[in-house]
């Protein structure tokens, strides 16, 4: 059950990419420390929501074990993470959608709670992590009432989550450059380098 002290949110785990840096392998299903990457995220976020969504474009039968429901891009050409965010916003049951990439297993509960607590301060605006001054839109918290504005930007041809969220008044949770919790393990080398880290 979700923590009642935090605002109710749906959570979207993005696992819909082509995995180009992994030689075409499905990143969310690659093992790290004995479990698929998606399993690490599932274990972390499951207590925070009763509406866990996974965006995936293949291996749906395997991802189903880690989600309350699955969504897929409405285009078959892997149009990028904003497509998954749109799909998540379309089905989210709560006022907020917490967005996370499937290949960041080192993010921790404390950071997610900081992001969720920020929601109470400006309920009309999206929040993103900003690491060393760099916006990280795939670690974001989006009010679901902004779905139509995001859809409008998509129809205008914008495919960048950062470009779409910033004009909506996005706020930042500031982190130091190189914060290891945001490490995307999206190449074989990064997976190997982080394999022994807890």
From Swiss-Prot:
It catalyses: Mo-molybdopterin + GTP + H(+) = Mo-molybdopterin guanine dinucleotide + diphosphate. One of its GO terms (molecular function) is metal ion binding. It comes from the Bacteria. GTP binds at residues 14-16, 27, 73, 103. Its cofactor is Mg(2+). Keywords: Cytoplasm, GTP-binding, Magnesium, Metal-binding, Molybdenum cofactor biosynthesis, Nucleotide-binding, Transferase. Its EC number is 2.7.7.77. InterPro entries: MobA-like_NTP_Trfase, Molybde_CF_guanTrfase, Nucleotide-diphossugar_trans. SUPFAM superfamilies: Nucleotide-diphospho-sugar transferases. One of its GO terms (biological process) is bis(molybdopterin guanine dinucleotide)molybdenum biosynthetic process. Coiled coil: none annotated. It is an enzyme of class 2 (transferase). Mg(2+) binds at residue 103. It is found in: Cytoplasm. GO terms for cellular component: cytoplasm. The N-terminal domain determines nucleotide recognition and specific binding, while the C-terminal domain determines the specific binding to the target protein. Monomer. PANTHER family: MOLYBDENUM COFACTOR GUANYLYLTRANSFERASE (PTHR19136:SF81). Transfers a GMP moiety from GTP to Mo-molybdopterin (Mo-MPT) cofactor (Moco or molybdenum cofactor) to form Mo-molybdopterin guanine dinucleotide (Mo-MGD) cofactor. Belongs to the MobA family. This is Molybdenum cofactor guanylyltransferase. It comes from Pseudomonas aeruginosa (strain LESB58).
């Amino acid at each position: 059950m979700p923590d009642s002290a935090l605002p109710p949110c749906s959570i979207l785990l993005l696992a819909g990419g082509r995995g180009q840096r992994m030689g075409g392998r499905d990143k969310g299903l690659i093992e790290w420390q004995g479990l698929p990457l998606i399993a690490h995220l599932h274990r972390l976020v499951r207590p925070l929501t009763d509406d866990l969504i996974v965006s995936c474009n293949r291996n749906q039968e395997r991802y189903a074990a880690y989600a309350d429901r699955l969504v897929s891009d409405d285009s078959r050409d892997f149009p990028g993470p904003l497509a998954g965010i749109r799909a998540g916003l379309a089905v989210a049951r709560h006022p907020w959608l917490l967005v996370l990439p499937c290949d960041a297993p080192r993010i921790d509960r404390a950071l997610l709670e900081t992001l969720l607590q920020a929601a109470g301060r400006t309920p009309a605006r999206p929040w993103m992590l900003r690491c060393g001054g760099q916006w990280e839109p795939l670690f974001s918290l989006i009010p679901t009432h902004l779905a139509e504005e995001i859809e409008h930007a998509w129809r205008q041809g914008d495919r960048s989550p950062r470009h779409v969220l910033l004009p909506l008044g996005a706020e930042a949770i500031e982190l130091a450059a190189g914060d290891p919790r945001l490490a995307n393990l999206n190449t074989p080398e990064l997976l190997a380098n982080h394999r022994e880290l807890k």
